[in-house]
Amino acid sequence: MKINNSKIEILIASLILVLITLGIVLMYSPIYFHANDDGIISGLANGQYTGKVSIELIYGSKIYGSLLAVLYFILPMFQWHGIILLSIVLFSSIILFLEISKIEKFTFLYRIGIYIIVINSYLIFVISPTFTKTALISGLTGTLLIYKNLITQNHKVIIPGFLLFMSAIIRPDGFAAVLYFAFPALLYTLYIHLKNIKTLVRYMVSFFPSVFVFIQETYLNDIFGRLPDEWKKYWQFLNAFHQIHTNPSMTKMHQEIAAFQIPGLEWTNVEATLLTTVTYFDPIIFNPSQMELAKNHVNDFIGIRGLLNSEFILTLNRIWEYMVQINYLFYVLLGIILFLLLVIKKFGQVFLLLAFTLYVFFLYYYLGAVWRIPVRINMPIIFMMIISLLILISYLKIRSIKNVWLISIISSVFVILFQFQPKGFIGIQENLIKKQGEQEAISNELKRVNENGIFIGHIKYGYENYTNAYVTRNNHRSLDLTSGWHVFSPPWNQKAKSLGISDANPTFVFTNKKDVYFVGDDYMGQVMGMFL
């Protein structure tokens, strides 16, 4: 009877996810990707820029690019990038439902609370899909299964291995965060099962494919020269840009640029502003040697040197600036950790919880000190830690199980309240409706200026991509490009050259081509005016 009840729970919860998907897609279409990166990925894969499908993706692996290329070639009307992301998150959520249904130690109310949290996490993803969230949700679900298997000594590795692999191929650099969370489990596996070769091999099989893809895409492609020359140059530029643009020291760098304190750097504060806002790249001004100088300058603020140079209180404030955007979720996570510290019986388990909490804090401190923690990274990590801890509680020795259901229900209430905040479902839905109106206005403006006009640069209405996440058809004229760092990508350069533009440079196009124009917001308009 218990098995039947579990199956019914999974069936009902899964049906709710399907209904949520259909309801949101029908009610709010067109749904846009959460970030412009996904719009660019789909544009590269489906041939929007070059007229033919491509396996070369920005931020994605060749394996994922090959899969997308085949699907776009067979059925080009579907936005396969978004559909695959949605399918993986749906599968991950159903796997989480399966794990929740196995919790027999506590009451049904306890399971209800976790079901609600998973459903709310899925709800946000459907209306704002992105490959970063997918990689984290899939990878951290696989990581949860590995930790649970180690606790229960039930060594099933196929599904965890699949989830980790999908995380790695969709976003190799995003998989680094997943690998960070999985690393203690990997060390523990090596320590405990070193003499049990059969079990050790099973776990290595689950880890190896994803880790191999991560290493290959992050390091080996460049070492063994498997990338075409134009893509090598692009990745060299992109990596330099990322270290500069996403670094917390960029404000300080601006001050030093304005004071001419960086030897050899020929930028003024205007060029630095254009670089920081990801709006305009002049291949002459932002040439490889200048980018390298800027990158070397910020090297003192990244990696180990960045941690050593960071100011503790300033970094904590920076972390809180990111965390306050999802503060209700953060409060839930803290509440669960405090609850566990109070109810766990075994000192060893308390010690492990404290050690893992410090381990996670170190990751956030590193990101706050030398990088950044945007919501699309922070939210899925916090959600998955909440869900994972609530599932793993049932496998721990605790003092009393009488009122444990309260922590699950209270957590679910706070998660529901979060949905009414700007970064929750209601806020995202309002922003989506606003963006739909913006796209119509952009389309009308493009038609008014020139039916065949091409927009390059930031639009005054917003900074993200207006690309439909689930179908390729668009009733409005959409933007070819919304982020400057893609200007140097080989497919975009190929498209620009086909239009008679020699260097794909927005400013040269702006001044010399009447059918291509630049629209900026008030601040960027002033900066562009200073430059021109």
Label the predicted regions.
Residues 202-210, 387, 396-423:
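Signature aromatic-anchored transmembrane alpha helix within multi-pass, membrane-resident enzymes
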Residues 108-114, 147-166, 197-205, 401-408:
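Short hydrophobic alpha-helices at membrane interfaces in multi-pass membrane enzymes
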Residues 157-174, 178, 183, 206-216:
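Membrane-interface alpha helices of multi-pass inner-membrane proteins
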Residues 444-527:
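Short periplasmic/luminal acceptor-recognition loop of GT-C membrane glycosyltransferases, typified by
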Residues 223-308, 476-491:
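Membrane-proximal stem/loop segments at transmembrane-domain junctions that anchor or position
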